[in-house]
């Protein structure tokens, strides 16, 4: 992300924003983000706070070390929301790019874990882990 922390604290947490739309692929993405949040590797943040210009959300996003944005489909609502809020340079994962078809991919634990695994890998690469 191009916006960097202004404090001397060394940066913020890794944050995740997800479109939690009505399609099955959006629910899969949402559940994957919630799973990762529970694991503690990155924190789920409120996407609606970006267009609302909610101070707490905006400040947290600006201070983030890395941001991962997950969309369920190629409409890319979460990506577009973040860009409209002035954020660029974030990681982006689209559930349908993993072979799941919108409205034809029932939510299963296997699908949720598949998205979570890709998200973990993206964050690890961005952190330089294993390089």
Language-model regions: role of each:
Residues 1-131:
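Iron-sulfur-associated redox domains of electron-transfer enzymes in respiratory
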């Amino acid at each position: 992300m191009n916006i960097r922390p202004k404090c001397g604290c060394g940066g913020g947490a890794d944050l995740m924003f997800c479109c939690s739309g009505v399609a099955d692929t959006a629910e899969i993405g949402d559940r994957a983000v919630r799973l990762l949040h529970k694991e503690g590797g990155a924190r789920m943040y409120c996407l609606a706070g970006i267009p609302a210009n909610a101070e707490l959300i905006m400040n947290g996003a600006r201070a983030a070390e890395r941001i991962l944005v997950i969309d369920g489909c190629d409409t890319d609502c979460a990506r577009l929301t973040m860009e409209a809020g002035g954020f660029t340079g974030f990681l982006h994962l689209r559930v349908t790019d993993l072979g799941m078809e919108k409205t034809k991919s029932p939510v299963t634990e296997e699908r949720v874990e598949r998205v979570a695994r890709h998200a973990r890998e993206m964050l690890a690469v961005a952190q330089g882990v294993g390089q």
